[in-house]
């Protein structure tokens, strides 16, 4: 019934909007847009004159594969990128790594507003399902990149711009379906420019999928609305967007034995009978979270050389994950953990219980950004500033227990609050030193104040009060021997604070990074190439240990010195009128230097070891055949080399190399009547049906009880299997 109502509403809206539209427009997915930049991102975006390594992804490129998978999966074929999916098929919880750096080190901004969670520093795209349908461009900067808003980039930064204003009215309906009972419905509309000054547009989306992993279902809803006023010198825009996700938990992974015999098995929600035998699974072992974003942007052209921008943001997030804790499976069942008093029943002391609990997050995030930009024929100057405040409440509630004594309903067994404030500003400039040489300088100061106070889920008291100030300078030169090519060199320093999990696990130090980039770009009519070398030197890097916490988040630790060296090549070559070839290569060496590890109770110097989750080879390729402007088909391939999930080079910690190919076909036509354009898209993922794992975890512990007086280090690993051959196909109607 829900789906039927959805279709009725969007069809009614589509015909109503079409009836009001009198202007004949070009029937393309990329409708005409105004030239005035809608959200001022000049200060944080890179251009061809910036000595930074970057790749731009357009709305048109995104739309070819946008059938319901998350943004990280849509960026999978970019240089040096590795993506992950807990549910195995790109819907639900997904992740991205760039140059071996995980998502907590990839700075993400939405219209210049930081999107990384202030405490965990992660990005959770599951909270914004189908956000790709509201994106006009994504810029991926590899390395430190330019100064940006939010925490410093330690591997990459991702600048996401939402949709431009449309000159003409339109509406569209898009439906896609595929393997694992995946179904996506999207309705979009725009009024176009009303009286040449006002515009209103929006999107509604639903995504449902059972996932590849058992019970790893996703039930996702999202919305995006924007209204704008613009004239020759002013653009004011207000945006409201957000999402609600309910996903059955699939972040536990499976061990090697289960992987070989039942790779889709999901241990989440296991329930056991009195004899210790598996009796079933808890049906509501879900993650349930809502995130709402409110943005206001004002961009003012002062004169032909100066412009000013102001951005305001409020984000509210609230939700929980619910779990059944079974005594037989070693769950969180003890009274000490649940903050309950033991009691006596007859002659038996009751001090543990099967239970159902919810662990909550309830947070508010306020941001203000300002920008002042000056541009002439020979120089540019950008000043940017940010102030943000985050308040996050963390608490756990007990919903049910078999033997909980006098505990009150929804008894809270932990409760704490994290508060993080940040103030930063940057000043950057480019100047044409000569006709062929452009200088670049970028200076940033960040101040961070982070506090945590209360009881965490150990239970134990956690008290953190940390104030940090960072100075991050950057500089470089671009040499342009001709109009179609450039050579650049840059140096960038980045420093940043630990995240919440780091503080919970000890007394972490801030990280420091010196990044050197040397690159060459050439852009001709039928060939574009970008090649670069990088040298990233870390001090006190918070490396992934390979272990994870109870919600699958990675655990990190400071190491002394570490290094990433690499070479990357990214090309687009028009082989013939109908053939386009887009290869990319990334070769790297990723090392801990002078690494120590305690094995069997003895501290050992392992010397140089591989950094966790850092493959030395990542290759991407796209070969596209377009016999006409209406049809194209392409094969996309990805090779990811062997990875270690820990930092001690243990063979038990490896993820095998894998080579995966997808087939993507798109057909468009214009009926030229009441439907302006129809677009059909299909993607067949993993066409060779490879069994592979793109993510996992590794842990060690010391066995001190099996042999008295002897310590034995035990290793363990878990894996996240990815789906074999599976497909998505969709139809989009533009009115």
Task: Report the location of each language-model feature.
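Short acidic/polar hinge/loop motifs at secondary-structure boundaries
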Residues: 114-142, 161, 258, 267, ...
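Transmembrane beta-barrel wall of Gram-negative outer-membrane proteins
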Residues: 170, 177-208, 213-250, 296-304, ...
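C-terminal beta-signal and adjacent terminal beta-strands/loops
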Residues: 581, 589-591, 642-644, 668-735
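Membrane-embedded beta-barrel scaffold of Gram-negative outer-membrane proteins
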Residues: 301, 307-313, 480, 486-492, ...
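Short, acidic, small-residue-rich periplasmic hinge/interaction motif at the N-terminus
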Residues: 21-64, 103, 528, 532
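Extracytoplasmic beta-strand/coil segments of soluble accessory domains associated
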Residues: 72-114, 136
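Gram-negative outer-membrane beta-barrel transporters
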Residues: 435, 535-537, 557-647
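A beta-strand signature from Gram-negative outer-membrane beta-barrel systems
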Residues: 129-172
